[in-house]
Amino acid sequence: MSRVGKLPIAIPEGVKIGLNDLEVKISGPKGELSKTFKGNIAISLAENKLLVKPLAANKNVRAMWGTARSIISNMVTGVKEGFKLKLEINGVGYRAMVKGKYLNLMLAKSHNTKIEIPSDIKIEMPKQNIIILEGTDKEKLGQFASIIIKQRPPEPYKGKGIKFENQFIPRKEGKKN
């Protein structure tokens, strides 16, 4: 039994759910999300709660059971409240700015890095070294954040690079004479 999978998903007010076999469409005040699931999973709606149940007892189906429930729960949270990620840029001369539909990163390379911003993600920049990402889809938000971080991951000696707001970077000692 999956401890995560057997929990029902409460549906808050203002969120509408559409079920079509293994396709789930969820719409709310922040937007609309849809996802098609594979595997032997049954998704049902009863008394303002979504239930996810496995149709087989093998290991792969049980693994997908909890995963599917978590994805649907994140979709409900996303269309109701949305998700927010905060990234910090550390380093002398490291900064970012939004130009149109591109995020322009200046990270001590010979060229500036331009990353296209997906249409369903909003970017706020209170300072040149802080990037706040907002969106309804937690998976796409995390993917976009990892693309940004991959441009200059934090290094352990001086701590320069792009990292999540509260991410701990283990520091190393430099060379000793």
Curated annotation (Swiss-Prot):
What the entry lists under Pfam families is as follows: Ribosomal_L6
Q: Which InterPro entries match?
A: Ribosomal_uL6-like (IPR000702), Ribosomal_uL6-like_a/b-dom_sf (IPR036789), Ribosomal_uL6_a/b-dom (IPR020040), Ribosomal_uL6_bac-type (IPR019906), Ribosomal_uL6_CS (IPR002358)
- Gene Ontology biological-process annotations: cytoplasmic translation
State the source organism's domain of life.
Bacteria
GO molecular function terms noted in the UniProt entry: rRNA binding; structural constituent of ribosome
What Gene3D superfamilies does this protein map onto? Ribosomal protein L6, alpha-beta domain
Q: What does this protein do?
A: This protein binds to the 23S rRNA, and is important in its secondary structure. It is located near the subunit interface in the base of the L7/L12 stalk, and near the tRNA binding site of the peptidyltransferase center.
Quaternary form? Part of the 50S ribosomal subunit.
Identify this protein by name: Large ribosomal subunit protein uL6
Species assigned in the record: Rickettsia peacockii (strain Rustic)
Gene designation per UniProt:
rplF
